[in-house]
Amino acid sequence: MNGGEKLESIPIDLIIEIHSRLPAESVARFRCVSKLWGSMFRRPYFTELFLTRSRARPRLLFVLQHNRKWSFSVFSSPQNQNIYEKPSFVVADFHMKFSVSTFPDFHSCSGLIHFSMMKGAYTVPVVCNPRTGQYAVLPKLTRTRYENSYSFVGYDPIEKQIKVLFMSDPDSGDDHRILTLGTTEKMLGRKIECSLTHNILSNEGVCINGVLYYKASRIVESSSDDDTSDDDDDDHERSDVIVCFDFRCEKFEFIVICFYGQLINSVQLSLKQKSHQKLDLII
């Protein structure tokens, strides 16, 4: 090649193909190379291609809470896909350390971690990508007189979007909202309606194929005709439900259950050590 000849630019399709095989940390760094590369790696096509290949090599996510230091560290390691293969020791990769002023309650979806932390006098939700180190502190949507609110993160597999559902406490009104991350949408989100007033029992939710499931309870009038009770509360009985929220159509459905239990998919396996550290394996 003569010195005066210019190298032909690499086709964008080839760049996307190459970088879709790289770790998330590398992709995050390459997004900062230029505006062109940043926009290229934000394309829905690249996101879907990268997620598809990432699912083919799943990883276990470990969260180590330092109880005395009010902080936690995030690690991950490859997940063995061959159950017949002889187990081997694997060194977990360190991703990030985060300091919080309260014990966060973790759950995850599509590689993101969702937890709560103290900001001033109030608890605010945080969504974090441990592989890239990026995080977003989300707004507290309820007014200051509201005591409690809950938030859940989920993935819309059709539109390829990460969304956050905010649910206010029943005593605080019906200010429920949905926020789509990575858009120009206002951080206050869009208000949505829920036909069933319910008490959320835990902010541990499970998102499967774009549908969020979480535990809740409602108060219903008792069908009993027994008037011998002196307690007005006996005129009502508790009804446990599983709330189903479809992130695609942004609609609620409800499954009435006759017993109280725990969503086993949301269980975090915890191991407390003598050093006052707790290791959570998020499934």
Swiss-Prot record:
Tell me which SUPFAM superfamilies the record gives. Answer: F-box domain
A Pfam family matched in the record:
FBA_3
GO biological process terms, alphabetically, are: root development
Q: Which InterPro entries match?
A: F-box-assoc_dom_typ3, F-box-assoc_interact_dom, F-box-like_dom_sf, F-box_dom
Query: What GO cellular component is one of the record's annotations?
Result: nucleus
User: The organism sits in which domain of life?
Assistant: Eukaryota
**Where does the F-box domain start and stop, copy by copy?**
4-53
The protein's name is Putative F-box protein At1g60370
Q: Which organism is it from?
A: Arabidopsis thaliana
Its ancestry begins with: Eukaryota, Viridiplantae, Streptophyta, Embryophyta, Tracheophyta
